Swiss-Prot record:
NCBIfam families: PRK00092.1-2 (NF000928). Pfam families: DUF150_C, RimP_N. Coiled coil: none annotated. GO terms for cellular component: cytosol. The keyword Signal does not apply. Belongs to the RimP family. Keywords: Cytoplasm, Ribosome biogenesis. It is found in: Cytoplasm. PANTHER family: RIBOSOME MATURATION FACTOR RIMP. This is Ribosome maturation factor RimP. Signal peptide: none annotated. Required for maturation of 30S ribosomal subunits.
Length: 155
Protein backbone atom coordinates (compact mmCIF):
# COMPACT_ATOMS: atom_id res chain seq x y z
CA UNK A 1 0.00 0.00 0.00
CA UNK A 2 1.38 3.41 -0.95
CA UNK A 3 1.73 6.31 1.46
CA UNK A 4 -1.13 8.10 -0.31
CA UNK A 5 -3.55 5.18 0.05
CA UNK A 6 -2.47 4.66 3.68
CA UNK A 7 -3.14 8.33 4.44
CA UNK A 8 -6.49 8.28 2.60
CA UNK A 9 -7.51 5.11 4.44
CA UNK A 10 -6.65 6.72 7.80
CA UNK A 11 -8.72 9.80 6.89
CA UNK A 12 -11.71 7.92 5.43
CA UNK A 13 -12.01 5.00 7.86
CA UNK A 14 -13.74 6.99 10.65
CA UNK A 15 -16.04 8.73 8.15
CA UNK A 16 -17.13 5.47 6.53
CA UNK A 17 -17.60 3.74 9.91
CA UNK A 18 -19.66 6.68 11.24
CA UNK A 19 -22.11 5.98 8.40
CA UNK A 20 -22.38 2.33 9.42
CA UNK A 21 -20.29 1.05 6.51
CA UNK A 22 -17.06 -0.92 6.23
CA UNK A 23 -14.09 0.47 4.30
CA UNK A 24 -13.11 -2.46 2.06
CA UNK A 25 -10.47 -1.01 -0.25
CA UNK A 26 -8.70 2.20 -1.24
CA UNK A 27 -7.00 2.50 -4.61
CA UNK A 28 -5.26 5.56 -6.07
CA UNK A 29 -4.32 5.16 -9.73
CA UNK A 30 -3.37 7.15 -12.80
CA UNK A 31 -5.17 6.17 -15.99
CA UNK A 32 -4.04 8.16 -18.98
CA UNK A 33 -3.81 11.80 -17.92
CA UNK A 34 -6.30 11.40 -15.04
CA UNK A 35 -5.97 10.29 -11.42
CA UNK A 36 -8.69 8.24 -9.70
CA UNK A 37 -9.30 7.66 -6.02
CA UNK A 38 -11.45 4.54 -5.79
CA UNK A 39 -12.99 3.64 -2.46
CA UNK A 40 -14.96 0.44 -1.97
CA UNK A 41 -17.45 0.26 0.92
CA UNK A 42 -19.80 -2.42 2.16
CA UNK A 43 -22.33 -3.23 4.87
CA UNK A 44 -24.32 -6.31 5.86
CA UNK A 45 -26.96 -6.81 3.20
CA UNK A 46 -24.95 -4.87 0.62
CA UNK A 47 -24.45 -1.30 -0.53
CA UNK A 48 -26.83 0.57 -2.83
CA UNK A 49 -26.41 3.71 -4.92
CA UNK A 50 -27.77 6.03 -2.21
CA UNK A 51 -25.22 4.61 0.27
CA UNK A 52 -22.44 5.31 -2.24
CA UNK A 53 -23.72 8.85 -2.85
CA UNK A 54 -23.88 9.60 0.89
CA UNK A 55 -20.41 8.17 1.52
CA UNK A 56 -19.00 10.03 -1.50
CA UNK A 57 -20.36 13.33 -0.19
CA UNK A 58 -18.94 12.82 3.32
CA UNK A 59 -15.59 11.49 2.06
CA UNK A 60 -15.29 14.41 -0.36
CA UNK A 61 -15.82 16.89 2.50
CA UNK A 62 -13.10 15.37 4.68
CA UNK A 63 -10.70 14.88 1.76
CA UNK A 64 -11.08 18.55 0.78
CA UNK A 65 -10.36 19.57 4.38
CA UNK A 66 -7.38 17.23 4.94
CA UNK A 67 -6.10 17.53 1.33
CA UNK A 68 -3.71 14.51 1.30
CA UNK A 69 -3.51 14.36 -2.52
CA UNK A 70 -1.77 17.14 -4.44
CA UNK A 71 -3.05 16.24 -7.92
CA UNK A 72 -6.60 16.77 -9.15
CA UNK A 73 -8.46 13.43 -9.06
CA UNK A 74 -11.84 11.82 -9.59
CA UNK A 75 -13.46 10.26 -6.50
CA UNK A 76 -15.26 6.97 -7.12
CA UNK A 77 -17.11 5.36 -4.20
CA UNK A 78 -18.64 1.96 -4.94
CA UNK A 79 -19.51 -1.50 -3.72
CA UNK A 80 -16.62 -3.99 -3.73
CA UNK A 81 -18.73 -6.21 -5.99
CA UNK A 82 -19.17 -9.97 -6.06
CA UNK A 83 -15.46 -10.48 -6.66
CA UNK A 84 -14.30 -8.31 -3.79
CA UNK A 85 -10.60 -8.30 -2.91
CA UNK A 86 -9.41 -9.94 0.30
CA UNK A 87 -7.34 -7.29 2.05
CA UNK A 88 -7.82 -7.70 5.78
CA UNK A 89 -7.55 -10.76 7.99
CA UNK A 90 -11.32 -10.62 8.51
CA UNK A 91 -11.83 -10.83 4.73
CA UNK A 92 -9.77 -14.03 4.59
CA UNK A 93 -11.67 -15.58 7.50
CA UNK A 94 -15.05 -14.67 5.98
CA UNK A 95 -13.99 -16.25 2.67
CA UNK A 96 -13.30 -19.72 4.11
CA UNK A 97 -15.53 -22.16 2.24
CA UNK A 98 -15.90 -19.79 -0.74
CA UNK A 99 -14.16 -19.81 -4.11
CA UNK A 100 -11.23 -17.44 -4.54
CA UNK A 101 -8.95 -16.36 -7.37
CA UNK A 102 -5.29 -16.11 -6.41
CA UNK A 103 -2.57 -14.47 -8.51
CA UNK A 104 0.99 -15.14 -7.35
CA UNK A 105 4.33 -13.37 -7.70
CA UNK A 106 5.96 -16.70 -8.52
CA UNK A 107 4.58 -20.12 -9.48
CA UNK A 108 3.36 -22.68 -6.97
CA UNK A 109 3.25 -26.18 -8.41
CA UNK A 110 3.85 -24.74 -11.88
CA UNK A 111 1.10 -22.08 -11.94
CA UNK A 112 0.93 -18.38 -11.02
CA UNK A 113 -2.88 -18.31 -10.98
CA UNK A 114 -5.24 -20.54 -9.02
CA UNK A 115 -9.00 -20.73 -8.51
CA UNK A 116 -10.33 -22.92 -5.75
CA UNK A 117 -12.22 -23.18 -2.50
CA UNK A 118 -10.46 -21.49 0.39
CA UNK A 119 -10.16 -24.21 3.02
CA UNK A 120 -7.84 -22.79 5.68
CA UNK A 121 -6.14 -19.54 6.58
CA UNK A 122 -3.18 -19.11 8.91
CA UNK A 123 -0.82 -16.25 9.60
CA UNK A 124 1.62 -17.45 6.94
CA UNK A 125 -0.35 -19.64 4.50
CA UNK A 126 -3.67 -20.31 2.83
CA UNK A 127 -4.95 -23.71 1.74
CA UNK A 128 -7.00 -24.09 -1.44
CA UNK A 129 -8.91 -27.02 -2.82
CA UNK A 130 -8.55 -26.56 -6.58
CA UNK A 131 -10.14 -28.61 -9.33
CA UNK A 132 -7.67 -29.59 -12.04
CA UNK A 133 -9.52 -31.22 -14.93
CA UNK A 134 -11.31 -34.14 -13.23
CA UNK A 135 -9.46 -34.28 -9.94
CA UNK A 136 -9.23 -32.09 -6.87
CA UNK A 137 -5.89 -30.98 -5.49
CA UNK A 138 -5.17 -29.36 -2.12
CA UNK A 139 -2.58 -26.60 -2.42
CA UNK A 140 -0.86 -24.69 0.37
CA UNK A 141 0.31 -21.21 -0.63
CA UNK A 142 2.66 -18.96 1.32
CA UNK A 143 0.86 -15.63 1.81
CA UNK A 144 4.04 -13.72 0.90
CA UNK A 145 3.72 -15.12 -2.63
CA UNK A 146 0.21 -13.69 -3.13
CA UNK A 147 0.09 -10.68 -5.44
CA UNK A 148 -3.72 -10.51 -5.49
CA UNK A 149 -6.55 -12.52 -3.97
CA UNK A 150 -10.28 -11.96 -4.41
CA UNK A 151 -13.55 -13.83 -4.25
CA UNK A 152 -14.34 -15.71 -7.46
CA UNK A 153 -17.78 -16.18 -8.97
CA UNK A 154 -18.09 -19.71 -10.32
CA UNK A 155 -20.93 -20.26 -12.78
Amino acid sequence: MSKVTERVEAICQPVVESLGFELVDVEYVKEGPDYYLRIAIDKPGGIDISDCALASEKISEVMDKEDPITEAYFLDVSSPGAERPLKKEKDYENAIGKHVYVKLYEPVEGDKEWIGELKEVSKDTITLSAKIKTRTKVIEIDRKRIAKIRLAVIL
